[in-house]
Amino acid sequence: MKPICKFLLAPALFCLGGVAPIFAQMSPLLPSEKAPLSDRYVAYQIEAKYDAKNHSLDAAETLTWTNYTGQPQDHLPFHLYLNAFQPKSTFTREGYIGGNRDVKIGAKWEDRKFGEDVIKSFEVVGMGDLTGNLRFIHPDDDNAEDKTVLEVQLPRPVAPNEKITFKILFHDQFPEVVARSGYKRDFLLAGQWFPKIGVWWKNAWNCHQYHATTEFFADFGTFDVKVTVPSHYNVGATGVQVAENTNADGTKTVEYKAEDVHDFAWTTDPSTKIVEDTVTISSGTVKIRLIMQPGHMASAPRYMDALKGTMKKFDEWIGPYPYSQITVVDPPHGGGPAGGMEYPTFITADTTWWMWDGLKVPEVVVEHEFGHQYWYGMVATNEFEEAWLDEGINQYTECKIMDALYGRDVDFLNTRVATAGERGVDHAVYLGLADLDPITRYGWKFIDSNSYSGITYSKTALMLLTLEHIIGEQKVREAQHVYFERYRFKHPTGDDFMNTVNEVAGQNLDWYWNQAVRGTQILDYRILSASSDRADWADKNAPKREKKGETEYISSVVVHRKGDFIMPVTLEAKFDDGETVRDSWDGVDRWHRYTWQKKAKLVSAEIDPDHAIWLDHDVFNNSWLHDGDGHATGKIAGYWMVATQWFAQFLSWLA
């Protein structure tokens, strides 16, 4: 049987007679007790019944949308993300070509259960049943088999500021867990599971297909979601639980509400354990809810401590977390693709039963995913087109917070055998890249998934760490704070971020942005040559001096700009009388020669002695050490270069 046939023979849907009355049962959203934080252009009400045996659900969605575009609209696009998990989708094609491991590992496509989001009926109140007006569109490529973007043609235009209400019946078939959504045994992570309207952005509809390397973009609004599951299943979701009712058929219905968010995810599993605590920050007391696998309970205190520390640092450095709850989901063994993901007020973590204390994976993942609550969740940039504004800025913030919580250089790995810091890992990943793509490239247009992750995450973090060298750590932190306060709930762009940094720094940094963000220039300064010879050897007329301390030496160091990235650099030279000399160079020319004549011999020279230029693509050519003939230093450096390149390639593969 061909895959598509196997897919079409998925378990039957609930009869329409059992689903249609859901609309009548829905109650309006309760009025909020606080002023809206966002524009709230969308209001979703969804009732879903989950079939745990077949990992599918049937749902009724009521969506009220306000036409904020400033012009009449007669066609509207919707995301159907679950349709990415099919053999001929753009996601799958890019996954095989670009090396996305979530698609390739494990069972072959022929042996998997696919994902699908099927529209059963599509109505607009006052316009009638528009199911016949639906068509799939492909704004990013020519793949007619891709069904991740749906367009509805309206019988009349929606006027500016007019509200319309959609009533949609749909059926989801979840895939075996892959790329942020799906099931593993009895565990389910329901992410990107409902029809979601696109965003009007930059005077056009922004509703990209689901790509192998891209995440998401949506408008802010409110959610009222009721999920019916077997009565012995635990449920966690975006927002807060407001009701739970037991049904006569052995199920229960759990209701969650969320405001000023742009997405909604949930999870269910019969075997999980719930751990709860609170943390107090400037905005008040926040409830922390851990949904743990029984075999991972030893990691619960690590998750909790890391999350509390992270929330306090974000509150101190960036701004307040305005929601009353954060939920952390611990995926089961074999459910790795569900781990390390963020949704509003809801994140997934990662650990194993054997996770030892010295390896900070649980802490790193929780810190990183909570950080997304700010850059992805509240600032809410376009992750299809400018993923670095979330992933990269968040990776930088992760480095800083992990430093503060656990200590620099040991905040990723800290054992007797070896240590590793967050920034060192990022640099190792970056070393393994060819730097073929600018940070600003659209997510699906990178040469491959390794380049996407290495550039978007690691290079952006290193770019901001290097920025500290230029304007100072406090200015970078202040710029992050100003950017967050100014643009939360606003969907800003990369230019907004860079202009904010320019403003806070009090200088035009376009010379840096053009190279580090918009360009692909390699930053690499090296010591081309170094020498320290007696002055009387160079000048035959110089008087001979035999007594110690009287012999003069002419020392020379030539620094070479090997890469195309122009950056001011500092050279530190040390002499055998204990003197240390530092000198700066603007780095513009291809090379620069430093020369000293003094009664001391040059013993070492180093570019960037403070190790502050994290974008340096080759740190092994930054130093010179006098050791007689120089062969020993070169040999040792060669061994380290080979080892580091291997490690960099390994980390790049993991990223």
Annotate each PLM feature.
Residues 56-84, 88-89, 99-102:
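Ligand-binding face of N-terminal immunoglobulin V-set domains in extracellular IgSF glycoproteins
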Residues 23-58, 184, 510-511, 515:
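N-terminal, polar/Ser/Thr-rich
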Residues 41, 80, 256, 289-557, ...:
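Hydrophobic alpha-helical and helix-loop surface patches within well-folded domains
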Residues 236-237, 509-510, 523-609:
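Beta-strand-rich binding/interaction modules
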Residues 8-21:
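Bacterial N-terminal signal peptides
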Residues 165-168, 601-616:
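Short, aromatic- and glycine-rich surface loops/edge beta-strands on solvent-exposed regions
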Residues 85, 172-178, 609-621:
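Short acidic/polar inter-strand loop motif in beta-rich domains
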Residues 99-127, 142-148, 153, 165-272, ...:
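Extended, low-hydrophobicity, Ser/Thr/Pro/Gly-biased non-transmembrane segments
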